[in-house]
A protein has these predicted regions:
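Active-site-surrounding "flap" and adjacent substrate/cofactor-binding loops of secreted or lumenal enzymes
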Residues: 49-64
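Glycine- and aromatic-enriched membrane insertion/assembly motifs of diderm outer-membrane
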Residues: 28-30, 37-44
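Short, solvent-exposed beta-strand-terminating loops
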Residues: 42-50, 181-187
């Protein structure tokens, strides 16, 4: 492509897929644009709408909790007090369920926001990598030792090998993984506190449900930890292999063409 201006590439890369469209990489640019638009809609439109909807759904139950609590304060009958407490607790559990769901959706929104940011980081790095490759691809042998040293810094090995698109993918994965670790840990702590409070109420069914949520999010957190570690270790191996094979990228020319020397005949040429 003749569109090889660095300032314009970087300027357009501020927009989803812009640098790719500018450099005529339309398929990749279209994929990035579609993914960023979908995540933007989910983070800024759908999630707030869902939270507002749940808040409205919980309002009648919250009002009922207040009504039965007030009635409990105004009664002196033990039988009526027990009945009112049972009704209040039932509505209180419904309100807690809405609160739990809202907390989960908010933490999911934060994780999706991180993936959106990571995707845009990849968008910028990959656009810059396209610009670098358009200027000519280096086929010099790179040092494996230097590649390993740089690879200890996340993305450093890929940048050393001038694989900027891979560096962007690495940063996207690490940003998403470590943010998801933080959000799931926040939910674990939230449910641990909920379980601690509920134990004083002798509500064994609710306590069991909370324990299941704690186990579920601990498993998710551990998966993200392992995922982040695997991505990092893979980036180190990838940097070393790319450095080892860096001088293998010399173009091998293979051509089949007619030859008119000594009569019409086919010829095969291999240029090392």
């Amino acid at each position: 492509t003749e569109r090889n201006s660095l300032p314009l590439t970087m300027l357009f890369s501020l927009f989803p897929g812009g640098g790719h469209f500018y450099s005529e990489h339309y398929v990749r640019g279209g994929f990035i644009l579609a993914a960023e638009v979908a995540l933007t809609y989910e983070v800024f439109i759908n999630k707030p709408y869902q939270q507002d909807r749940r808040f409205k759904q919980a309002r009648p139950y919250r009002d009922s909790v207040g009504k039965y609590t007030e009635a409990m304060l105004n009664t002196t009958s033990p039988e009526e007090l027990s009945l009112l407490r049972t009704k209040r607790d039932r509505y209180a559990n419904l309100v807690r369920g809405f609160s739990d769901k809202k907390m989960e959706e908010e933490d999911l929104r934060k994780a999706e926001m991180a993936w959106l940011i990571g995707l845009h980081v990849y968008n910028v790095f990959d656009a810059f990598g396209i610009w670098m490759n358009n200027r000519g691809h280096s086929v010099e042998q790179r040092s494996m030792g230097k590649a390993l040293a740089f690879a200890l810094i996340p993305g450093g090995g890929q940048i050393y090998n001038r694989d900027f698109g891979k560096a962007g993918l690495l940063y996207m994965g690490l940003i998403g993984a470590f943010t998801s670790i933080g959000t799931t840990q926040h939910l674990i702590e939230y449910y641990l506190e909920r379980r601690r409070v509920i134990r004083g109420e002798k509500n064994f069914e609710e306590e069991e449900r909370l324990s299941e949520r704690i186990t579920h999010y601990r498993k998710n957190r551990n998966q993200y930890i392992w995922g982040g570690a695997i991505i990092y270790l893979y980036s180190i191996g990838d940097a070393i292999v790319d450095a080892l094979l860096s001088d293998f990228d010399n173009p091998l020319h293979f051509a089949i063409a007619p030859s008119f020397e000594g009569g019409l005949q086919a010829s095969v040429g291999i240029d090392f």
